[in-house]
Structures are given as C-alpha cells and as structure tokens.
Amino acid sequence: MAGTMGRLSVGVTGLQTSQYALNATAHNLINTQTEGYTRQQVLLTDQSYNRVATDSYYINNVGMGVVTAQIRQVRDQFADDTYRTESGRMSYYKAQYETVSEIENYFGELEGKDFNTTLNDMWTSMQELQKESNSIVTRSSFISNALTLIDRVQTIRSSLIEYQRNLNTEIKDQVKTVNDLASTIYELNQQIRAVEAGNVEKANDLKDKRNQALDKLSSIVNSEVVNNEDGTVEVYLEGHTLVTLGRTYTLTTQKVCENEKYQQNYGFTGSSTDFLMPVWEQDGDPLFNINRVPTADSNSDIGSLNGLMMSRGYFISNYTDVPTKPTKPLEKDFANNADYQTAMAQYEQDVKDYVKDLEYFNTYVEPYTITNLEAQFDVLIHAMVTQINDTLCPNKTVT
C-alpha cells in the first residue's frame, strides 16, 4: 500500500508542476501584446530523494517526484545591451535630423520664397546695375532686392537663434525625464529586492517595468546597466553613477556661462548666452564632454539629449568664429628686404594664431549643427556685403 501511495505521490508532483507550466504558458499568451512583457519559462528540478537501502556497494534512493525550481524570464543580456545602445544611437541621429529638417524650412519655403532665389535676384540686379548704372529702373531694382536680401538674412539668423533658445525647453524636459526614470528604477529595485529576498519568488513583472524604464533611459542618454546578484541593478550615465542600491543621483540644468567647471576643465570661452546644459546637481560636473567629438567607435553618439546638445551648440556664433588662413607674402611685392622680413614675421605669427583658432573652431563650432551653420552663414553674408561694397564703393588711392 505504501509503495502504491508513493507512486501516486510522485504522479501528483508531476501534475502540479505541469499545472504551473500551463499557467505560465497562459500568462505568456495573455501578455503577447503587452508592451515590455518578457516571456516566462518554468524550470523543473528533482524533488528530494528517499533512501530505502544501502550497503558497501551501492545506495538505493527512490525519487519523490518533481518540483518547480523557478519561473525565469527569457532574456538575453547581450541582446538587451545591444538594443539599448542602438536605440540610443537612433535617438541621437533622430534629434539631429529633426534639427536639420527645421533649418531647411528657414532656407527653403520661408515666406513662400527660398533663400537661393533671393540670392540669385540680388546677383542679377548687381550685374544689371554694372551695365546700366545710370538707369533709375536698374537702381530701384537693386535697392529693392538688397532690402529683400537684408530682411531675409535677418529673419533667418533670428530664426536660428530663436530655435537654439527653444531647444532649452526640450533639454529641460529630457533632464526631468531622466530624473523621473532614475527614481522609478530605484523604487523598483527596492520592491524586487524585497520580493526575492527569501529566494522563493521571482519579481518578474516588476523586472519588466524596470526594463521598460531602462530602455527609455537608454534612448535619452548613454547608459550602462550592472546586474547584481540580489536582483537589483546599478545604472551609470556617461561614466557617472545614476542609481545605486542606496540612492539616486540627480541631473539639473545650468546656464553655460555660469558653469565654472566648463571654463576650468575644458577651456571653453564661448560668449555668454542663456543656453542651458545638463550637469550633475551634487557637484556641478557637466554630463557631456564638450571636447569630445561624438563617434560610433567610442559610443559617444548615443542619446537624444546628447543629440539636442550637438544640434544646438553652446553659444551663438558669427563669421569671426571661422578662421581665415593667412596668405604668405611674396618677396616680389615688397620694395626692400626689410619690409619683406617684417611681413614674414607677421605671417608666422598669423599662422600660429590660425592654428589656435582652427582648433577652437574644430572643437566648439564645427561639430555643432546650428552653431556651425550660423558661423558659415555669417561668413557668406559678410563676404557678399564686402563684395557689394567693393563693387559700388571701391577703395581708391587719391593722388
């Protein structure tokens, strides 16, 4: 009788574990359309054995059936890390794409007439003026096109600056989102740790919520996740701690011109603006390294917040921020050797200044979409105005 009951007991354990497995399958099917849900899998293991006989040659054990070892999530950490990296990279370039698309509107169909047409009209009227400088019609056409060009230039430049300032709002919103996600991850850490403390139950649904928060965080800023044995995670942003088991660290925004660490650590000397940048509230350290040009190899082209910063830049630029390569003097252009040597000495100094200015341009201007465009656009307009002035009012030596 005991043997029969023992076998029935073993069968009961099989039925029970099968029921658990069916419940897990049903749970998976119900949540197939649930965002962030991770498929769960039941792992089975042997129950304890009952020793019924033993001698010097063998031990005779009788199995007591099967039990559920755990219900685990079917996730691949490598796949998670890869997805978060590429999701962040997509968000980075999406932010820059949206900036470029907005800028194209300023130069394209702004006020129903693209900027290229305005330039062509101005150039045509200049040519006509050179042919018929005494014609009132030609002069009027030139003045009209010149006023139109000036108005368009002022409108485009003011639109670029206004767009830069408007990005402050997006930057503040994303910093707030990062802080909210950090708090969510921290709270879920505490709940998961409490549920799994007895090593009896797995907090799978809570982990799904945490993974959703981690996925969203990785799309905003480059993050690294470290899994702990107790089920909690630690999170790092750009090498700085964001979430630990004991606390969260907070980001805030600060005006670029008011952050001393940018001036000290990065040698940044950009003009004073009301542009905001993300910094760590605890020590004022900037979140991003302004001296680092983002690249895929270094995984520094990740996150929509970084994309916004690289789109906007840190200051308003103009043509003086674009270095002009000095022209080497020719000896034949000088009356004597002394004047030539003086010119060469000045040229050598100008080359040194040019190298320094070029380094500044490559670091603080060229990598930033709007800042670079402002500078290059100003160079174009400055050169055009100079040429117009030279054409209409040439410098002449009076003898």
Regions found by a protein language model. Give the residues of each.
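Structural signature of extracellular appendage/secretion-system components
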Residues: 1-399
